[in-house]
Each structure stands twice: as C-alpha cells, then as structure tokens.
Amino acid sequence: MRIGFDNEKYIKLQAEHIRERIGQFGGKLYLEFGGKLFDDYHASRVLPGFAPDAKISMLKSLIDEVEIVIAINANDIEKSKVRGDLGITYDEDVLRLMDIFRSMGFMVGNVVITQYANQPDADAFRKRLTSMGITSYLHYPIAGYPYDIDRIVSDEGYGKNEFIETSRPLVVVTAPGPGSGKMATCLSQLYHENKRGVAAGYAKYETFPIWNLPLNHPVNIAYEAATVDLDDDNIIDPFHLEAYGETTVNYNRDVEIFPVLKSMMERIQGESPYKSPTDMGVNMAGMAIVDDEACREAAEMEIVRRYFQTAVELKRTGVGEKWLAKLEMLMNRASVNVNLSPARSAALLKEETTGAPAGAMQLPDGTVVTGKTGPLLGAASALLMNALKGVSGVDDKLDVISDEVLEPICHLKTEHLKSQNPRLHSDETLLALSISSVTNPIAEQLIDNADKLRGCDAYFSVIISSTDEKLYRTLGINVCCEPKYEQHRYYHK
C-alpha cells in the first residue's frame, strides 16, 4: 500500500492542538467528538497510513487530562434505535463504549440522557445504570430549540438541565450515533460552568470534511459519498471566507447552525470566541497528508465502492434510489467511473467466458487474479484461494486442498445439513485449508500470508452471500458486487 498519511505526525499535532485550545479557554474544554472514535476504517481507506484507532491513540496521549461523557437521546432508547454497523441498540452501545474506554484506562463514569421527558424505557435504562454504579444525568427538551436564544440560555432552558460533575481539563462528549445531543450537552455545561464562575470553552472534533483541502478534493467527496443517506453536503465556509479571506470547507449543517450557535455562546460568555464553523474545529488531519496523490487515488476508489454498496442495497431493499443518483453525481465530480478498478472488468469477463458467477481481485503488486464458480467452490472461495496463492507466490493451477478434503465437507452440507448449495463458502474453504496445513506446508504458507490481502479490492459479477462478504471484510478485503442476484428468488440470505 502506498502511504499518503503520517499517522504519528497526526497524533502529535492533534494532541498539541487540543492542548492549545484548552489553554485558550483558561483550562477547561468540552470537546464534541463526532464520527468514530475507534475502528475508523473509512478514514484508513481514504487516508492510507491512517490507523483505524488513530483518534483513540491520540486521546491516550492525553489520558491524564481527559474524561469521557457519553450522551444518549431518551427518544432513541424508547425506539430501541439500533446501530446499523453493530446490530445493537444505542443503550447497549453506551455500555459497550464504557467497557472499551475503561479497558484502555480512560476516566469514564458519566452518562447524560438527553431529551428526557419521562420516557418509561429511559427510566428503566437509568435505573439499570444506577444498579451498575454508573452516574447519569438528565437533560430536558427546550421549547423553541435551537432558535429561541432567550429561552435556551436561561434558567428555563439550559438552567433546567442537571449539571454534569467533571474534574479534568478535557471533557470528551461522545455518543452511540448522530442526534444524541452532544453539542447541546457541551453548551449546557458551558452555561452552568459560567454561572459557577468557571472559565470553559467548546470545540468540535471531526475528521471529515478536511477543512484545508479543496472542496472537490476526492477525500472530501468521499466523505459526502459515505454520508449520502444523511444528505450532508460539503460547502465553502462563508463565515470563514468573510472573516479571514481564506477558503475552507465545512459541511452544510454546521454552516447553517453557526449563527445560532454563535449567538448562544455570546449570550453565555459575553462574546463568541469563534468567527466561523471552521474556527470551532480542531481537526489536524490535513496537516499529516504526506502524499496527496496517494490519498486522491485511495479516495477515488472509496467513492466507487460506496456507489456499488448503495446499488446493492437498492437491489436488496428497494430503498436508496436518490442516494444512488447522488453518488453518480459525486463520481462525475471526482472524474471516476464504475470501471476504476481493473478487477471489475476482469470479474465480468470471467463470468462471460464461464457462464457462471465470478470474481476478481487486484493484489498489492497490481496483478489481478480471478475466481470462477466450480463444482466444489463458489466464486468467492475460488477467488480467495487464487488470491492467497498470488500473494504467496504459488502456482494458481496447484490444488492446495485436495478433493478428498473438500468432498466430505460438501457431502455433510447437502446430505446431513440439508443445504441446497453443495459449494463451500469462503469461511468453510479457509477451515479446509487450515486442516490441510497439518500435512501440507503450502497450505500453511497460504494461511500465513492472509494478512497480505488486507486493503485489496474484490469485485464480483453477482451479489455474494452475507457469509462470504463477512469473511472477506474480516480479512480486510474491500468487496464490491454487481447489483444482481445469481438466482431469481424473493428471499436471499
């Protein structure tokens, strides 16, 4: 992988900048933490060299100065809102986050339940927190929010909210997902701190869009592609342009709410420390890009991946037609198309010549390998085997797993487990490869080289099974599928 981002430089710069911002406000900063704190694979894909855990590593460098508050919207508890990427409810994710933070040595003990209006499930969750020894606080709906500044910044607004007791100079406010009330929590705390005579400030930390990259830089376009379902648009920050004569990039929701936010801060603190939404941010990611072309190429690939993901989701659910149209527009803006990766045309050609579903993958050295549907292995399994051979320097015609190993597994599937598909999925193929490695050193070599496939792009001529897709993602392989099924059925796993 061609490195375009200096992760160590980023961690150092980011920590220094946050410390500067703490000092700017007299020693106390409420930092709204947007996006993913850990496992930020989008950032690692579009900024090659960015570690998925870079943000949490940066926070660990400030560990003695930071404490964490987790916000959750009472309405999300009531609706049992689920995190799509994890398949767990927001309230369960609060507990998961607390476990992770604590295991890393962070000070985390406070949960704030926002938009609380006596929701029964929120009451039950609070009782559960109390039984675990976790302190929780209630923040209430405010009539006229966010535009009725007089009411909001008063004893009838933020004044009604419970003050969250904190002791460290940096208070990171995070949440299971968007709409949890992170910003409102920070501003409510500023109101209460100010009434107590404590100097404190607010800032926002989000990786994307990167404010000091051009509006139409592929990295920023890739952010729009990733959030296409949120209707986020990157725009030039007009407030920053007017105040400083500098062109910077922000997203539409932050720009739209800035005049209101500025008025709130003026009311709370007497004056606003910020002249623009860009001023509010602390993101230093743009300063750590060391190879712009590498980041451009990586981001272009991500835009195309998002297109295929959305096209497949539209085929599966019937939802997302307008999102797909927007992604086509974003691809045009980035001057890329669906054939950006040579693996796609290779997969389609393989299907055309064999008359059955096929796949292709571009390996780290740029070579493209293919996999076809056979009597014992599906396309995903065949491609995985050929890719492992490719990165291991093994002849792709060599049968590393003998039919004597494969056939009993296929027999078990069809005769005893009553599967209609005798072919092995990719996870089953890896197990067969593992069994073979006991007596076959080449099989062991293939397993040892599996990590070399991380970051590769695989394309399939049909939508592959969820089992195969999950295994590929576990190996760190990016998967794109043509939006069509192998068989015409109403139900697909």
What do the PLM-derived regions correspond to, one by one?
Residues 1-173, 189-351, 356, 363-365, ...:
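Flexible phosphate-sensing "switch/lid" loops adjacent to ATP/NTP-binding sites
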Residues 177-178:
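The conserved Walker
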Residues 185:
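Hydrophobic positions on the alpha1 helix immediately C-terminal to the Walker A/P-loop
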Residues 372-373:
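Short clusters of small/polar residues that mark proteolytic maturation junctions
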Residues 376-392:
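A short, polar/charged loop-to-alpha-helix boundary motif
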Residues 390-422:
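Short HxH-centered metal-ligating active-site micro-motif
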